[in-house]
């Protein structure tokens, strides 16, 4: 009988141990499932963060590339403008001398030799300016253009000179290609 009791006690211990181990295995399986789900959720969140960072960096990269292209275009445009108008400073410096030559030619009492010499200088200056794309602004009889003309006086309009027409040029204006070096000083009909 003592043997039977010992066997019963052992069987009860084994069954208790088995049931305890079984419940521990179920709890462990449930905990493993929860841990796996948590890890999966965390991994998905991390992936979303990394994708957002990637998208942001990609956007910054594209914007930086566009800015570089814009800077390059701006630089090329400035270089072309510098090349196009490289003689502007020289042309502006020559214009007053040309004006003085024209005034000297306008004096009637000068000797013929002096007049001939001054006329040759004027011709050479005009030729040099023309070769460097400097041209006189046509003004007299033209419609007044504030970009090309500087009105210094107005006169009443009449049949010969309608309103907003240049009546007389007081000082010639000049352009370098399409840029105004000096506007023509004019009298305008109002």
Swiss-Prot record:
It holds the Pfam family GrpE. InterPro entries: GrpE (IPR000740), GrpE_coiled_coil (IPR013805), GrpE_head (IPR009012). It is found in: Cytoplasm. Keywords: Chaperone, Cytoplasm, Stress response. Residues 1-40 are annotated as: Disordered. Residues 22-40 have a biased composition (Polar residues). One of its GO terms (biological process) is protein folding. It comes from the Bacteria. GO terms for cellular component: cytoplasm. GO terms for molecular function: adenyl-nucleotide exchange factor activity; protein homodimerization activity; protein-folding chaperone binding; unfolded protein binding. Belongs to the GrpE family. Participates actively in the response to hyperosmotic and heat shock by preventing the aggregation of stress-denatured proteins, in association with DnaK and GrpE. It is the nucleotide exchange factor for DnaK and may function as a thermosensor. Unfolded proteins bind initially to DnaJ; upon interaction with the DnaJ-bound protein, DnaK hydrolyzes its bound ATP, resulting in the formation of a stable complex. GrpE releases ADP from DnaK; ATP binding to DnaK triggers the release of the substrate protein, thus completing the reaction cycle. Homodimer. This is Protein GrpE.
